[in-house]
Amino acid sequence: MTDCLLRIEELSVAFHTPEGTARAVDRVSFSLKRGETLGVVGESGCGKSVTSLSILGLIPSPPGIIESGCIRFEDRNLLELDPEALRRLRGHDISMIFQEPMTSLNPVIAIGRQVAEPLMVHQGLSRSAALAQAGEWLDRVKIPAARRRLEDYPHQLSGGMRQRVMIAM
């Protein structure tokens, strides 16, 4: 097993629109070893989110397209994986904590169900087992009265608690 967990090489991403082509990411390269933390910082609109979404295979196509580069995770080129293999990888081996949880959480679904869903999909847990696990995860991220909060909706939580729900997921 390689020491390099994630390697991005010369990644370029563009969005083709009727008004022209917008180059969101231009030849970005970086690597991340196991146990390391990488902070991606920059001005608004510089490509941080597009880079992260590219790693997860979540660039909307069209209009977005990865024009060139390589994204390797544990020695697998993610750009060569079929959609099902990439879906299995997402949420189990690699994930993203979105910056604004209110736009990522579904406002009409209780948070317990939202935390439980990836557990059912990626670990094959039953609904009841996944909800029990969701309560444990909410407790681990220090949501007060975590098991009672399983039935709460995103708008009933503070911004910080919503962010912790995303971390639990």
PLM region descriptions:
Residues 1-169:
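ABC transporter nucleotide-binding domains
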